[in-house]
Curated annotation (Swiss-Prot):
Protein name: Phosphoribosylformylglycinamidine cyclo-ligase
GO molecular function: ATP binding; phosphoribosylamine-glycine ligase activity; phosphoribosylformylglycinamidine cyclo-ligase activity
The keyword Methyltransferase appears for this protein: no
GO biological process: 'de novo' IMP biosynthetic process; adenine biosynthetic process
Organism ancestry: Bacteria, Bacillati, Bacillota, Bacilli, Bacillales
Length: 346
């Protein structure tokens, strides 16, 4: 039967080898609350040790999008898993939740053990950065659905927060200060446009260094999404945070308003932070309008935090002590949407 399945394109032995290879990486993510080991039908996590008055579970799921195609082109698969974790855990930490565990789903045309191992190695690294355990996953070999070189990757996370400490943004008022945490680069959104502008229309090479970039283009584009969990959780222990926004698809324009109550807008001070060269390259090569850039990309800011004005400098200092690059980038105002430099609302 195994031979018949292999003739149909599914290599069971390769799947077993991939699982064997990934175990050592998964083990590095374990927390004391995890029950059982890799290979069970379901992952188990003990919540009894959490001393919360009204514990609330917060879940999130996401993928990496067409950034995967850059990984295929560069044949580099050991960091794309970090992106999958980041996209999930950053989404739930903005609500004040501590990520507890993570599960992954890999669908591929052919299960190559070394490639699967590298993907899971990256996922495990992301979990370590976020402090969550990789307690399960699925690797589905689907010949005919994907080519032999292709795969898709998605992740799922669950976190916990005390109900009274959930961050909703509903208490944000005009005059609160917006602090931006620097991104590592493009992160995991907008890659369909990136490929069209830089690779298809611009015909740029992944191996070359362009403009003010410090790395070859391929390495720049595959920089992993920054995981903000640990510095944000440390911040929440010491300061009151009124709202947070993970700057993903939709950029500043779509994501900052998601944390704001009705009647409150955001005024962003352009020039208050460094916009990385990769965004300048994209805008120049693609002849893109600034409005479009801020409506698609993170433009150098991956997370925005709203705090009281009197706390702002201390919050920046704490975040910098945690290794982040943090800047005061604006404030909340009466109104709606996002305004730049007090000028045109984009």
């Amino acid at each position: 039967m195994a031979n018949a399945y292999k003739q149909a394109g599914v290599d069971i032995e390769a799947g077993y080898e991939a699982v064997s290879r990934m175990k050592k990486h998964v083990q590095t993510t374990m927390r004391k609350e995890v029950l059982g080991g890799l290979g069970g039908f379901g992952g188990m996590f003990d919540l009894s040790k959490f001393a919360l008055e009204e514990p609330v579970l917060v879940s999130g799921t996401d993928g990496v999008g067409t950034k995967l195609m850059l990984a295929f082109m560069a044949d580099k698969h050991d960091t794309i898993g970090i992106d999958a974790v980041a996209m999930c855990v950053n989404d739930i930490v903005v609500q004040g939740a501590e990520p507890l565990f993570f599960l992954d789903y890999i669908a591929c045309g052919k299960a190559e053990p070394s490639k699967i191992e590298n993907i899971v190695k990256g996922i495990s690294e992301g979990c370590r950065q976020a402090g969550c355990a990789l307690i399960g996953g699925e690797t589905a070999e689907m010949p005919g659905m994907y080519s032999t070189e292709e795969y898709d990757l998605a992740g799922f996370t669950v976190g916990i927060v005390d109900k009274k400490k959930i961050i909703t943004g509903e208490k944000i008022e005009a005059g609160h200060v917006l602090i931006g945490l620097a991104s590592s680069g493009i992160h995991s959104n907008g890659y369909s446009l990136v490929r069209k502008v830089l690779l298809e229309d611009g015909e740029l090479s992944l191996e070359r260094i362009y403009g003010r970039l410090e790395l070859p283009l391929g390495e720049e584009l595959l920089k992993p999404t920054k995981i903000y969990v640990k510095p944000i959780l440390e911040l929440l222990k010491k300061h009151e945070v009124y709202g947070m926004a993970h700057i993903t698809g939709g950029g500043f324009i779509e994501n900052i308003p998601r944390m704001l109550p009705e009647g409150i807008g955001a005024e962003i001070e352009l020039g208050s932070w460094k916009i990385q060269p990769i965004f300048s390259l994209l805008q120049e090569v693609g002849n893109l309008e600034e409005k479009d850039m801020f409506n698609i990309f993170n433009m150098g800011i991956g997370m925005v935090v709203a705090v009281k004005e009197e706390d702002a400098k201390d919050v920046v200092r704490l975040l910098e002590e945690q290794g982040e690059t943090a800047r005061i980038i604006g404030r909340t105002i009466q109104g709606a949407g996002v305004t730049f430099n007090g000028g045109t609302a984009l």
